[in-house]
Amino acid sequence: MTSISLNLIMAFSLALAGVLIYRSHLMSTLLCLEGMMLSLFILMALLISHFHMLSVSMAPLILLVFSACEAGVGLALLVKTSTDYGNDYVQNLNLLQC
């Protein structure tokens, strides 16, 4: 395993640990999710170029598109939550309320 792959796997695991540790605020959770998606994108692009897999060469771009959609929905949820409640606590996102 090269040092670049190891660094990207470490970045992914640190972002995952950030999601698990800083889950009280929505903004920090969204930033950690973006870090996870970015490290997955770079790792996937490097692995595809290293192994010359042309059949799945569009997969990193598709992952990047889904990451952008996730960021847009997350920011819309953040704006809606902060205008309704005045803060960005995840505990305000109770899906059982009607």
Curated annotation (Swiss-Prot):
InterPro entries for the chain: NADH_UbQ_OxRdtase_chain4L/K (IPR001133), NUOK/Mnh_C1-like (IPR039428)
E.C. designation(s): 7.1.1.2
Topology versus the membrane: Multi-pass membrane protein
Pfam families with a match to the protein in the record: Oxidored_q2 (PF00420)
Keyword annotations: Electron transport, Membrane, Mitochondrion, Mitochondrion inner membrane, NAD, Respiratory chain, Translocase, Transmembrane, Transmembrane helix, Transport, Ubiquinone
Catalysed transformations (reactions): a ubiquinone + NADH + 5 H(+)(in) = a ubiquinol + NAD(+) + 4 H(+)(out)
Protein localization: Mitochondrion inner membrane
Coarse class of the protein's main subcellular location: mitochondrion
Record GO cellular component, one term: respiratory chain complex I
Protein purpose: Core subunit of the mitochondrial membrane respiratory chain NADH dehydrogenase (Complex I) which catalyzes electron transfer from NADH through the respiratory chain, using ubiquinone as an electron acceptor. Part of the enzyme membrane arm which is embedded in the lipid bilayer and involved in proton translocation.
Entry protein name: NADH-ubiquinone oxidoreductase chain 4L
Species for this entry: Vombatus ursinus (Common wombat)
